[in-house]
C-alpha cells in the first residue's frame, strides 16, 4: 500500500487529485427548523479516492461526528466505507469503518515512530485514552520494542480505567502505566508524545520536553486539512 502511494498511483478528491475530502459544517445560527447547529466536532465528511497497484479499487469513507453522541452511548464518530468497481461504478461492499479507521489512524503515527523516534525509546505518553489512543499505542509498541512505560492523561476515570485494562490485556511488554494529573507530568521525560484528544496543541508546546522526543498529533486532522503532525 505505501509503495503504491509513494509511486503516486492513486487519485483523491479535488482539482489537484490530493484533497483529503469535503466537510459539511453547520452554521452557528441556523435559520431553518431542524437544521443542526455548529458545535465542537459536529460535522459530516466524505473522503473519496481511487487506489491503483494491485488494488484497482475506488471507494470512499463517509462519517458523521458529534461529541454529544457519548450521552447516547455512541462513539463520537460513526463511519461507513463504500467500495466500488473502478470501471462500472457498481458497489462491491458497504461496511462499518470505525475499526478500520481507528487502526489506520494508529498505523500512521506508528510509521512515523519507526523512522523518527529514538531507537531506545522506553516511555510513551498517550493524551486521550480512547480507541485512537489504543491503536496508536499498539503501533508504537510494534516498532519500538524497548517501550516499557505508558503515561496517560485523560478527562474521565471511566476512560482511564478502560485504557489501563486494555494495556494489561493487550500489551504484555508494558511494565508500568502511569495516570497523570497534569500535562506537565504526562509530557515530562517521555520519548514519544501522542495527542489523540481534541486538546489544543498549545497545551503542550510550552512544556519542557525530553531532547529527541517525538510528538504526534493524531486528532487535529479536521483542523489542518488532514495533515498528520509528526515532528
Predicted regions and their residues:
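Short acidic low-complexity segments
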Residues: 174-190, 205-207
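Short glycine-/small-residue-rich Rossmann-like dinucleotide-binding loops
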Residues: 197-199, 222-223
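NAD(P)-binding Rossmann-fold cofactor-contacting core
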Residues: 143-170
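Short helix-loop-beta connector
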Residues: 116-123, 146-147
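N-terminal ligand-binding/catalytic initiation module
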Residues: 1-102, 108-110, 120
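Glycine-rich Rossmann-fold phosphate-binding loop(s) that bind the pyrophosphate
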Residues: 129-130
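Rossmann-fold NAD(P)-binding glycine/threonine-rich loop
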Residues: 216-231
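Rossmann-fold NAD(P) dinucleotide-binding segment
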Residues: 200-217
Amino acid at each position: 500500500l505505501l509503495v503504491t502511494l509513494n509511486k503516486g498511483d492513486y487519485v483523491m478528491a479535488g482539482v489537484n487529485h490530493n484533497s483529503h475530502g469535503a466537510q459539511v459544517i453547520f452554521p452557528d445560527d441556523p435559520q431553518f427548523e431542524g437544521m443542526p447547529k455548529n458545535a465542537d466536532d459536529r460535522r459530516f465528511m466524505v473522503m473519496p479516492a481511487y487506489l491503483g497497484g494491485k488494488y484497482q479499487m475506488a471507494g470512499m469513507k463517509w462519517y458523521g461526528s458529534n461529541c454529544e453522541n457519548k450521552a447516547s452511548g455512541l462513539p463520537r464518530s460513526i463511519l461507513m466505507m463504500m467500495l466500488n468497481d473502478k470501471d462500472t461504478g457498481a458497489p462491491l461492499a458497504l461496511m462499518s469503518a470505525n475499526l478500520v479507521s481507528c487502526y489506520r489512524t494508529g498505523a500512521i503515527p506508528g510509521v512515523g515512530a519507526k523512522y523518527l523516534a529514538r531507537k531506545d525509546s522506553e516511555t510513551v505518553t498517550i493524551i486521550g485514552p480512547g480507541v485512537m489512543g489504543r491503536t496508536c499505542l499498539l503501533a508504537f509498541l510494534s516498532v519500538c520494542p524497548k517501550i516499557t512505560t505508558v503515561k496517560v492523561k485523560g478527562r474521565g476515570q471511566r476512560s482511564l480505567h478502560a485504557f489501563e485494562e486494555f494495556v494489561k490485556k493487550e500489551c504484555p511488554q508494558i511494565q508500568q502505566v502511569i495516570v497523570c494529573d497534569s500535562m506537565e507530568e504526562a509530557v515530562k521525560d517521555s520519548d514519544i508524545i501522542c495527542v489523540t484528544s481534541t486538546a489544543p496543541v498549545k497545551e503542550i508546546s510550552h512544556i519542557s520536553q525530553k531532547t529527541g522526543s517525538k510528538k504526534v498529533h493524531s486528532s487535529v486532522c479536521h483542523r489542518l486539512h488532514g495533515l498528520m503532525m509528526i515532528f
